Regions:
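Ligand-site clamp/hinge motif
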Residues: 131, 223, 252-299
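Aromatic- and charge-enriched surface segment that lines or borders ligand/interaction sites
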Residues: 115-164, 185, 276-283, 343-347
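Alpha-helical secondary-structure segments
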Residues: 67, 147-154, 181-187, 233-234, ...
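Gly/Pro-rich hinge or "lid" segments in bacterial periplasmic/extracellular proteins
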Residues: 92-96, 100-106, 200-266
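N-terminal secretory signal peptides
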Residues: 1-22, 29-31, 44-46
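A structural "hinge/loop" feature
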Residues: 71-91, 111, 166, 195-205, ...
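N-terminal lobe/hinge region of extracytoplasmic solute-binding protein
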Residues: 69-124, 156, 230-232
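Surface-exposed binding/hinge segments that line
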Residues: 167-216
Length: 347
């Protein structure tokens, strides 16, 4: 897709001829992640869709235990040290970012009171600064308030090379300062068309300054709270066995009204993709399993007459690469790269 075609597609969204969802799906097909697709529309002056959750809770709790299965189990619970989705998802039970993404690529606030935009003056005209306003009713699980000092600390923590944070790429080229206890400004060295990276999504989860400030830099791996998170999220830490089990209990002071629904959560790790699929679809031992890299015929067989269903969600992530092991130069029955041939090097 060239620039003219992209501009035409964006204009089609503006005029209503193409839906926002279809635009995002088209961009995914070209390898552009949903968040970046959403930012393209925002910078073109197309208002973000108003997102509402499908869940309309009337009270907090009452849903019993939620049991989920990640056959690649979490090995630590500090989001700045996450080495994959397994660690990010394990951490997300307890920690939260300022904002995240919905399934249509819309930015949605979490710890932020509102989203930065040019309309409200929190995105500078030159694209070199962003201002975040925090919610004022958020507490860490130990009762201390979340403030802008925590946000600034996460930048200092992650951008320090001696911390060896896996999130350093999101924080090393910015400057962050507190305007007041609930306002933070992020400055970029140059105009940033995609500013929603630091403090957003899986790489943007906020850890508490008062528990980690003594463990910056070279001492970062020694922090006891790397394995015992104290966050702002819907569940409070109960226990953790690396690679095996993460347990949380409902946070009675959670800042979102009537959430969460489930009273406890168990995130089990281990096994393989097939056994994970079977544990949900066939035996019903778990309520949900993620990353089912299983042949379609096996999933269909497990789903048919079983106790669950398979949800397939398109995305831009790369899980693995398969090499074509056939010979592209040898023709068999009028076909090149026939399965009847072998690649001269890769086979």
């Amino acid at each position: 897709m060239n620039e003219q075609e992209l501009r035409g597609l964006i204009e089609a969204v503006r005029t209503g001829r193409v839906s926002r969802r279809d635009f995002v799906m088209t961009m995914l097909g070209f390898g552009v992640a949903a968040p970046i697709a959403g930012q393209l529309l925002m910078h073109a002056g197309i208002a973000q869709a108003q997102t509402t959750s499908a869940y309309k809770g009337t009270k907090r709790g009452g849903g019993g235990a939620l049991k989920v299965l990640w056959w690649q189990g979490a090995t630590l619970l500090n989001p700045h040290f996450a080495v994959g989705t397994k660690d990010q998802d394990g951490s997300r039970i307890f920690y939260e970012p300022l904002a995240g993404w919905d399934t249509d690529g819309n930015l949605v606030p979490c710890l932020a009171a509102e989203l930065p935009s040019m309309d409200n003056g929190s995105v500078s005209q030159d694209g070199k600064s962003i201002t975040w306003k925090l919610k004022r009713d958020v507490q860490w699980h130990d009762g201390k308030p979340l403030t802008s000092a925590d946000v600034v600390f996460n930048w200092e923590y992650a951008s320090d090379p001696e911390t060896s944070a896996t999130t350093i790429g999101s924080y090393k080229d910015i400057k962050v300062r507190a305007i007041d206890p609930y306002t933070v400004r992020v400055d970029y060295a140059k105009s940033s068309p995609f500013w929603a990276d630091p403090f957003v999504g899986p790489r943007g989860m906020i850890i508490p300054k008062h528990l980690f400030e003594g463990y910056k830099g070279a001492k970062s791996r020694d922090a006891p709270n790397n394995l015992k998170p104290v966050g702002t999220g819907p569940y409070k830490f109960v226990d953790f066995t690396p690679g095996d089990m993460v347990r949380g209990a409902i946070n009675p002071n959670y800042h979102q009204a009537n959430r969460p629904f489930f009273d406890t959560i168990e995130m089990k790790g281990g096994g393989d993709a097939v056994s994970a699929a079977r544990a949900v679809l066939q035996t019903g031992e778990f309520d949900y399993a993620w990353n089912l890299q299983v042949e379609d015929e096996i999933l269909v067989r497990l789903e048919t007459g079983g106790k669950g269903r398979v949800n397939i969600i398109p995305g831009g992530d790369i899980e693995f690469i398969l090499f074509n092991s056939t010979d592209p130069w040898t023709e068999v029955d009028g076909e090149r790269s026939s399965v009847k041939t072998k690649h001269p090097i890769l086979s």
